Amino acid sequence: MTRANWFKAAAALAVAGIVVVYLYDPPWIGGVTSGLRGWEQDPPGTFFRWTTGRATFFVPSNATSMTVPLRAVFPGPDGTPVKVELRDDDRLLTTIELTDPDAWVRTTVPLKRGGRRRFRRIDLKISRVVGPFYLGVMTGEVVMR
């Protein structure tokens, strides 16, 4: 291999390393969501987003707790509660049962100490969705402390 080829290979490896380091903890990930529809407003003026069967959003890693408002408009068969599993970076935080379709349930959960990343991933797994639009539960504005 010639000296020029060694230089090109070293430059390509350096660029690849920089990209990997950048994508390990990207600064823009805090605004990324998955499984959540756009913001809507119900008649009393509460802002919310519909989930699908699974939803993901990111919160700052220095947050010590968060309050997640949830509402299940479509109860399960025979009025069974809709269950929402909350996870923090794949670690189970809690399972919330939503029994009243007319009530917002605001659950505050503690978060573990932040790691080396700027943001942590919060996952919601909803036990029941209603077709044809795969609507899960209504999720309000999450408050972090």
Stretch-by-stretch model annotation:
Residues 3-10, 17-145:
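C-terminal luminal/periplasmic domains and tails of membrane-associated envelope-modifying transferases
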